[in-house]
From Swiss-Prot:
Protein name according to UniProt: Acetyl-coenzyme A carboxylase carboxyl transferase subunits beta/alpha
Top EC class, one word: transferase
Subunit structure: Acetyl-CoA carboxylase is a heterotetramer composed of biotin carboxyl carrier protein (AccB), biotin carboxylase (AccC) and two subunits of ACCase subunit beta/alpha.
InterPro entries reported in the protein's UniProt record: Acetyl_CoA_COase_a_su (IPR001095), Acetyl_CoA_COase_Trfase_b_su (IPR000438), ClpP/crotonase-like_dom_sf (IPR029045), COA_CT_C (IPR011763), COA_CT_N (IPR011762), Znf-ACC (IPR041010)
Carboxyltransferase: annotated span: 40-570
Catalyzed reactions per annotation: N(6)-carboxybiotinyl-L-lysyl-[protein] + acetyl-CoA = N(6)-biotinyl-L-lysyl-[protein] + malonyl-CoA
Length: 605
């Protein structure tokens, strides 16, 4: 086992002349290596690939191998986003003081000004994105890590005030290590100053769009970076308030790799969308178009309760009367309809959104806790008209249903919906809701996060939103989970959809202690579109092609679209006070009771 352990090692000795000769050969080899100019190649921090610098620039400074987004300077970012020759820089001549007389600060600023050719850590100005004018700010992390001192705070505030004065949207690209320590309390106060300016911008009804880039941290995160109407982010960007190492030291735990990254914030409800840098220009352009305040004058006339079959678009089915549709709908039993709308073949909210609207862009998150995938929502065009679209989304197989929580929204879903609806009011966009849920999500977590409060806030908020709202039950309309999206000026149901206080199974279980009597429960609950129109709970029934929307989803979409166009055209002509009064009276009038007169009451006593 120990054989040879203490055996003497044999060495080869070289005379001094030979050593000198070998060193000379090594030096010659080094001098013969090809010289590579500085800046010719770049190394990816993520996958360690070596990339030709010119190729990297052509690819928007995105690694060809792994998609890693390199950090870029403010001027480079502006050049990537705006139309050529449209940039007009604002406030070029504001430069930093040294308010605390901090040793070496002024010299450091001077040095960085020469090195970066920037005067401060942000550029602001006016520019066009695909022809659309905006105020744009871009931070540069090369300049004192993009930290916010008096100059950065002032330039951000002036940019926002320019947006207010010129009636323009404001777009801010953030890249910052946070507050500028060398300016002390002056730096801290910039957080309040910039946030107050954004409040004034929002009062004016102008869009504020933020793009979070790597890194966005500290005081910038805790002020103007997280106050956007729409918050976008580049992939894998570091975004957070406290540093990861500080948190780990405090809680004595190792945090996951994805912690404080863009995708982490998307999952937790604080980012609307993560967008590849190559797509950023067109996405921003699209969002700006969706926020134009002037509505298009051209609106197509809707053809009420008629449809074009996608199988034979040249043949238009004759419009049927309300009574014909009502009688046709009675051919199936209530529980037959329950089973029909639960079919995995039934068109979902996203199916209708894709068929009816143009340019739908989905936004995520409740800005409090998470994004709920059982509710989808965002902006789109309806025949050129910007609208807010929200839908409860089920899955078609087990995996998708698990991802969508079986179409049963949690509090985050309802809070996301109300956030999008409040934005619709701010920017004067009609709201269209697609309802399809067996009910709100129930569970320990949902209750801990306030499911009841979330639904209540939706009902409260929707009752007074100053824009038209149309809600359409396309499948199941289950209890408060459905009602949370149906406080609307018009409530419609597809011919075979159902809308109820609880599922038939739940009704039978509660009242008869036997969930197997669901069919009998459905018969007495008055849950069909035909029942609810007779009870004056809903406003309209939309005929399903071939008496089943799943047989021709495209035709069903055309019916919905025609009705939406016609109704929105009518609703948009109403004065706001009239719209709100009629919405209030609509729900105020619902209820059945007997009220005895004072005389009857005294006799009974």
């Amino acid at each position: 086992m120990f054989k040879g352990l203490f055996k003497k090692t044999k060495y080869i000795s070289l005379n001094p002349e030979r050593k000198t000769e070998l060193r000379s050969d090594q030096n010659d080899n080094k001098s013969n290596k090809p010289h590579i100019p500085d800046g010719l190649w770049e190394k990816c921090d993520s996958c360690k690939s070596i990339i030709y610098a010119e190729d990297l620039k052509k690819n928007y400074h995105i690694c060809h191998e792994c998609g890693h987004h390199f950090r870029i300077g403010a001027q480079e970012r502006i050049n990537q986003i705006i139309d050529e020759d449209t940039w007009v820089e604002l406030d070029q001549n504001i430069i930093s003081e040294n308010p605390l007389e901090f040793e070496g600060y002024s010299e450091k600023v001077d040095k960085l000004q020469k090195k970066t050719e920037l005067k401060e850590a942000i550029l602001t100005g006016l520019g066009k994105i695909n022809g659309q004018q905006a105020v744009i700010g871009a931070m540069d992390s090369r300049f004192l890590m993009g930290s916010m001192g008096s100059v950065v705070g002032e330039k951000v505030t002036r940019a926002i005030e320019t947006g207010i004065d010129e009636n323009l949207p404001v777009i801010m690209f953030t890249a910052s290590g946070g507050a500028r320590m060398q300016e002390g309390i002056y730096s801290l106060m910039q957080m309040a100053k910039t946030s107050a300016a954004i409040s004034k911008l929002k009062d004016k009804g102008l869009p504020y769009i933020v793009v979070l880039t790597d890194p966005t941290t500290g005081g910038v995160t805790a002020s103007f970076a997280m106050l956007g109407d729409i918050i976008l982010a580049e992939p894998n960007a570091l975004i957070g308030f406290a540093g990861k190492r500080v948190i780990e030291q405090t809680i004595k735990q190792k945090l996951p790799k994805e912690f404080q990254r863009a995708e982490f914030l998307l999952k937790h409800g604080f980012v609307d969308k993560v967008i590849n840098r190559k797509e950023m220009r067109n996405k921003l352009s699209h969002i700006l178009k969706l926020h134009k305040t002037k509505q298009p004058s051209r609106m197509l006339d809707g053809n009420d309760c008629s449809y074009y079959s996608s199988k034979d678009a040249s043949k238009k089915a004759s419009a049927k009367s309300v009574e014909e549709i009502r009688q046709q709908g009675k051919k199936l039993t209530p529980y037959d309809k329950v089973k029909l709308v639960r079919s995995k073949e039934r068109p979902t909210s996203l199916d209708y959104i894709d068929n009816i609207f143009e340019g739908f862009i989905e936004f995520h998150g409740d800005r409090y806790f998470a994004d709920d995938t059982s509710i989808v929502g965002g902006l789109a065009f309806l025949n050129g008209l910007p609208v807010t679209v929200i839908g409860q989304q089920k899955g078609r197989d087990l995996q998708e249903n698990i991802y969508r929580n079986f179409g049963m929204p949690n509090p985050e879903g309802y809070r996301k919906a109300v956030r999008l609806m409040q934005q619709a009011e701010k920017f004067n966009r009609p709201i269209i809701n697609f309802v399809d849920t067996s009910g709100a999500g129930c569970g320990k977590g949902a209750e801990e996060r306030g499911q009841g409060e979330a639904i209540a806030q939706n009902l409260y908020t929707m009752s007074s939103l100053k824009v038209p709202i149309i809600s359409l039950v396309i499948g199941e309309g289950g209890s408060g989970g459905a009602l949370a999206l149906t406080v609307a000026d018009e409530v419609w149901m597809l011919e075979n959809s159902v809308y109820s206080i609880v599922s038939p199974e739940g009704f039978a279980s509660i009242l008869w202690k036997d969930s197997s009597k669901a069919k009998e429960a459905a018969d007495v609950m008055k849950i069909t579109a035909q029942d609810l129109q007779e009870l004056q709970i809903i406003d309209k029934i939309l005929e399903e092609p071939y008496q089943d929307a799943s047989k021709d989803g495209q035709a069903m979409s055309e019916i919905i679209k025609n009705n939406l166009l016609k109704t929105l055209d009518n609703l948009s002509k109403k004065e706001t006070n009239d719209l709100l009064t009629k919405r209030y009276e609509k729900f105020r009038s619902i209820g059945r009771f007997i009220e005895k007169s004072n005389l009857d009451s005294s006799i009974n006593q």
